Design a protein with these regions (language model features):
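Conserved, single-site charged/polar hotspot
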Residues: 1-254
Length: 254
């Protein structure tokens, strides 16, 4: 059975069985509800601009400066349009989900600042290489960025998604091949765009057993998805996908 929930004019739909960071979430637009595998499958259908009202505060604190919020709105709009065209969730009747698998939606309540940022950039997108750009974004940079091939395993580079140094000086490259240089990069007073973020540099401690278990689980998961990405070094120096997913003792890091 297919159910459509349409709120009264100007109203929102509140889902009391779900908890977000701000409590029970409220949604603009309409709900389409289906029973799938004995669970409710809910799609929230609403205009793109109204969707962005609740994406911007979920991805960036609305206490930030207005121009930063507007930039986030443009990136979020561009990303959403690109995902709509990609049709990754077409089988489910949706364009995106509300998690970090796409971009976070309605984890924090929309407010005047997020609405203004969206309204004042209405219809604006990032355009590159004769199409809407793939505006991937992240919360904190360690001082460098990676390219689209390294992060998303893209088949070809994007001129606007190349690895680059994001430091507050004139350096365009970094040589971190030596352990001492890498240690200085992590522990020294390195100024960058995100220097003031609490996650710019951080420290944690795990046991050897925990680390081995964690890495083994990730290797197994990645192997199950794409065996060619997990290869074992042979005695002759070549690499081959053997199905070995258990992590042995680490002897050397290159």
């Amino acid at each position: 059975e297919h159910i459509v929930v349409i709120p009264a004019s100007g109203g929102k739909i509140r889902v009391e069985s779900v908890n977000k960071q701000y409590g029970h979430p409220e949604y603009r637009g309409i709900f389409e509800i289906d029973l799938v595998d004995k669970a409710l499958h809910i799609i929230n259908e609403l205009p793109l601009e109204e969707y962005l009202y609740s994406v911007v505060p979920s991805e960036m604190p609305t206490e930030y400066q207005k121009e930063a919020l507007k930039a986030q709105a443009v990136c979020a709009r561009s990303y959403a349009i690109k995902q709509m065209a990609g049709k990754r969730l077409a089988a489910l009747g949706a364009h995106v989900d509300d998690s970090v698998s796409f971009q976070v939606y309605n984890n924090l309540r929309e407010d005047a600042a997020s609405i203004a940022a969206v309204n004042e950039t209405k219809g604006q997108v990032v355009f590159a290489e004769n199409q809407v750009a793939e505006t991937y974004f992240y919360s904190v940079s360690a001082g460098v960025s990676a390219g689209i091939k390294e992060v998303w395993f893209a088949k070809k580079d994007r001129s606007y998604l190349m690895p680059c140094v994001l430091l507050g000086d004139s350096r365009k490259t970094l040589d971190l091949q030596k352990e001492a240089d890498f240690s200085e990069f992590l522990q020294g007073e390195i100024k960058s765009y995100d220097t003031n973020s609490p996650w710019y540099r951080w420290r944690t401690t795990v046991s050897e057993k925990q680390l081995q278990q964690f890495i083994s689980e990730k290797i197994k998961s990645r192997y199950e998805k794409n065996p060619t990405q997990i290869q074992t070094k042979q005695k002759d120096g070549t690499f081959f996908s053997t199905g070995q997913t258990e992590l042995g003792e680490i002897k050397k890091v290159e």
